[in-house]
Amino acid sequence: MTAKIGIVGSGNIGWALKQMLREDYEIRQGDITDGFDASNIEHVKKFLTGLDAVISAGPFSVNKNIAGIASKEGIAYFDLTEDVETTDFIRGLKSKSILMPQCGLAPGAINICAAGMMEEFDSVSEVLMRVGALPRFTTNEMSYYLSWSTNGLINEYCNEADAIYEGKAVKLMPLEGAEKIVIEGESFEAFNTSGGCATMCETFEDKVENLTYKTIRYPGHLNHMKFLFNDLHLKKNKDCLLYTSDAADEP
């Protein structure tokens, strides 16, 4: 019997998930463009009926609804959220099924890789996680192409970043801590963003001296973001920021 998997969202990530899973599973996909509103509890209940698992590839704001109902119905739940508060909510749910948030590149794969490498050593003094989903070539002033959620990106850039400093869990300001990275002769910049550490600061507090996560971008991107978020105070007007970011990302 083929397992039934639901995918919430049919954007770039939702589309990719369907391509990867459709040959081995029965897929049900729902998106706001099809009339499925994941912020509506009744819509979510109907969508989840009969599923074995659900993957949320929608905005993080709908994940509490989906995870909450999945936990009650015993449906396995996965998402790719970077939102710390949403993750804490899901971790607090009780269910007989698997509830696994933060299954993306970062948080997700980068944390598995880092934790796996740490296990190879008797003691670890410093862990530096640096991740950037970048286009090979850029065509706009922001030197970036958004391949995932605009809401998620704004969330990463607005909220505090988790880190471990001198063995203790701390909070760092987003868009700060800039550093230069050179990869195969090409220069990049990296800076603090929220969510990338997942729960590592909780897991490894007092077990590692320093642990940080930063997002990699092409040079100049950070200055543009600081202008939008800080100088224009758009971090306090996220609707305007969302519109601006989407408009700038159009081809």
What are these regions (language model features)?
Residues 53-67, 74, 79-86:
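N-terminal glycine-rich "phosphate-gripper" loop used for MgATP/nucleotide binding
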Residues 122-241:
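Active-site-lining helix/loop region of Rossmann-like oxidoreductase modules
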Residues 13:
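Hydrophobic/small residue at the entry helix of a nucleotide-binding pocket
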Residues 243-251:
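Single conserved hydrophobic/aromatic residue that forms the stacking wall/gate
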Residues 82-99:
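Rossmann-fold NAD(P)-binding glycine/threonine-rich loop
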Residues 10:
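Glycine-rich Rossmann-fold phosphate-binding loop(s) that bind the pyrophosphate
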Residues 31-42:
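Adenosine-cofactor binding site in Rossmann-like domains, unifying the SAM/SAH pocket
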